[in-house]
Curated annotation (Swiss-Prot):
UniProt similarity note: Belongs to the UPF0251 family.
Protein name as catalogued: UPF0251 protein MA_0157
InterPro entries on file: RNA_pol_sigma_r3/r4-like, UPF0251
UniProt-listed HAMAP family: UPF0251
Biased composition (Gly residues): 99-115
Stretch list, region Disordered: 91-124
Length: 164
């Protein structure tokens, strides 16, 4: 069996979980949707790309894209029909550039670190730890999970930060 090819994800998704309305105790289960599965749905339904075009963007074969889309839709449908929460994390993907900017202007630093469940395979989305650093003046601030460092402005000089 050959190794699984990591998929290109152009967009850092800020939502990490969706839950049915109601008390937490009433939600029996959750479904895990990976980052690359969410990207497959985004490219297909929000960017209206054909499966061939979307597969090229993710640098995978069209048949792989089709299987990932089917799997993602099955998971979301299961969650909606059975009232399950959807947790979004992990997957086998990489961001296209290692400076925190990706083609969509977002993304974690360290494109290769995003394999599996993030930094060290135990974290989420490239790891919740770490710092955002200003490339212009060197100022550092702790990374806030769920917020791309490229969206944070340096307190000293106003430049966009990058993930360290």
């Amino acid at each position: 069996m050959r190794p699984r090819k990591r998929r290109i994800v152009d967009f850092e998704h800020s939502a990490r979980q969706f839950r049915p309305f109601g008390p937490e105790s009433e939600i029996p289960e959750e479904v895990l949707l990976t980052i690359d599965e969410l990207e497959v749905m985004r490219l297909s339904f929000l960017e209206n790309l054909s499966q061939g075009e979307a597969a090229l963007r993710m640098e995978i074969h069209q048949s792989t894209f089709q299987r990932a889309l089917k799997k993602a839709l099955e998971k979301v449908t299961d969650a909606l029909v059975h009232g399950k929460a959807i947790r979004i994390e992990g997957g086998d993907y990489r961001m296209p550039r290692g400076d925190g900017t990706g083609p969509a202007g977002q993304g974690p630093v360290g494109g290769g670190r995003s394999r599996g469940q993030g930094k060290g395979r135990g974290g989420r989305f490239g790891g919740p730890d770490g710092n955002c650093v200003c490339p212009a003046c060197g100022y550092e601030t702790p990374h806030t999970p769920g917020v791309s460092c490229s969206q944070v402005k340096c307190e000293k000089c106003g430049s966009s930060m990058v993930r360290k």
